[in-house]
Each structure stands twice: as C-alpha cells, then as structure tokens.
Amino acid sequence: MALTVDVAGPAPWGFRITGGRDFHTPIMVTKVAERGKAKDADLRPGDIIVAINGESAEGMLHAEAQSKIRQSPSPLRLQLDRSQATSPGQTNGDSSLEVLATRFQGSVRTYTESQSSLRSSYSSPTSLSPRAGSPFSPPPSSSSLTGEAAISRSFQSLACSPGLPAADRLSYSGRPGSRQAGLGRAGDSAVLVLPPSPGPRSSRPSMDSEGGSLLLDEDSEVFKMLQENREGRAAPRQSSSFRLLQEALEAEERGGTPAFLPSSLSPQSSLPASRALATPPKLHTCEKCSTSIANQAVRIQEGRYRHPGCYTCADCGLNLKMRGHFWVGDELYCEKHARQRYSAPATLSSRA
C-alpha cells in the first residue's frame, strides 16, 4: 500500500533505516522511537521508503539516504510502501478483540489441518519404522536378541562420544568365561567383554541374556579405547633422586650410615656402577657445622666441604659463593676483611 507521510521537523526525526543499493535491499524503516516525531506521523517499522522529498530512493546508497534524511528541511516528506501483513506486536488498526480472536482461530485451524495431512502421508507402518542400523531404531526386546547383536541408545551415545567421560567409572571384575565392567553409578547398564570366538564376529556389541548388559568384543575399537584410558591413568612413579634423598635423610635420623647422594659439586666416584650401587660412600660433612651435606656441597679444598649457607666470611658473614674467598690462617674471609688483616696483598691467597 503506497502512502505519503510528512514528519514535522526539525531533526532528529526519531526513526532508523536499513538497506540501500550497497546492501542490495530496499531502504526500510527498522525502528521508530516512542513519543517521537516519526511516531506522531504514523511511521511504522517495516515501511519501505520509496522516495525522500520527491527524490526516488531506489538507487540510493545507505549513507546517501541517511544524509538526505538528516539534512532535510521541515517537514520531511516520505513516500512509503507499507505491507498489508501484520508484524508481531501490531494490528494495523484492527483493535477489535473479535477480529483478533477470529484471526487466531484461523491460524490454529490451518496448523491443525497441516498436521493432519502430514500424519496421513506417513500412515504406512513401513514408512514410519526406521531402517535397521539407523541411530533412531528402537532396541528390540530381550527375547528377540538371539541371532544378531543389538546395542542400546545409551551405549551408542557412550561409544560415539569423543571423550568417553563414562569410561573413567568402569571397573573390571573376574567372571567365568568373560570379564564384566560395571559402571560406578547405580542403574547404569553393565558392559560385558566376551572372549574371542572361532565363529564370525559382528562389528556391533550384543546384549546379555541377564538383561541390560552389553557384550563387547576384545578386538572392538570401544574396548581398546577403554583399555587405553585405564592404562593411561597409572600411578605416578617416584623419581630416583628424590628416593635417594629420602633414604639419606631417614638414615641420618636413625643415626646409621646414610646412602650416597651424588651432587653436582661433589667429586664423582671412579668405582664401577655395580660396586658403587652395592657400597655407596658416605655423604660429605660440613667442616663448619659438622653435619652431613645431603644435597649441594661447596668444595673448598681436597676433602674439605661446606654447605652453601656455611660458605661465608668469618668476619661479616657475607656469602662467598659468587665472590670467592681468601685464606687468612685457617679462616675464610671476603676480600675486604682479608685486606684489613694483611696490608701486603702478596700474602693473600685467593680462590675464584
């Protein structure tokens, strides 16, 4: 329906548009502001703008149409093409409840007739029953499961899921002639694994006669995935270094001979591997605190070791690990305090 609308100005006019030549759609009103000028002029969402102030809007770009509407003098004259179809939330002037009720009943009657025609087209039992092997086929009863294996819909979803979350709850228990995997939650179907048989095998699992149980072949992909998930969850192993350290600490607490713990700063043993493992040497003893060094040791001289925390200046307590030490008598000093005790630098012996 073609009509002309005059929107009183000035701008803004109170509506939005969409479409244009660049969108390959006609220019259409998409939103009208409440209590706006376009609302007062009876402009509605869904109206197609044919002309703006007498100029055809068929070949206009979206930005061009926006510019002409914004810069239009008052009043803004729009030639519209309004569809007769009623949009949701609008009645196109039909405010009578009887008219609306009649339209609603007519739409309901149309829907009912379409459903009846659909049911009549599928009235044949063969057309309604799904084909064998389809995912929508219902599982047969337990009495008819004699020749061909069947699988329930719940197990199909378990087998087709990529992550197999239910496989974490499977636990195997011994059984004569088969192994049974029971799900952790009560009410779930159990999975039975049959030993390989000499006859031809079916690619699908079968149902057990006890009811609700599924039979899996050991060569099936589902069973292999379940086995891989179980083997991948093995308990973490303790590292050999940590085990040696733990044994050394326990032996030291008991007052016995601690086991040998190799260190990056300790001298490497020249004994064969078999002899070194059989009779491990003692741990190094710190010459300052007279305790065993269980982890890292600082080698000062041949047969003299200290903890990294005990390798300090005898005067100021500065750690000498990254600085080196100076001997003054039988004590270790940093460079500053060693020079204070000896004025002649030639008498100092240093070790970097």
From Swiss-Prot:
Residues 1-84 form the PDZ domain. Residues 284-344 form the LIM zinc-binding domain. It comes from the Eukaryota. GO terms for biological process: actin cytoskeleton organization; heart development; muscle structure development; protein catabolic process. The keyword rRNA-binding does not apply. GO terms for cellular component: adherens junction; filamentous actin; nucleus; stress fiber; Z disc. SUPFAM superfamilies: Glucocorticoid receptor-like (DNA-binding domain) (SSF57716), PDZ domain-like (SSF50156). This is PDZ and LIM domain protein 2. The lineage of its organism: Eukaryota, Metazoa, Chordata, Craniata, Vertebrata. The gene is PDLIM2.
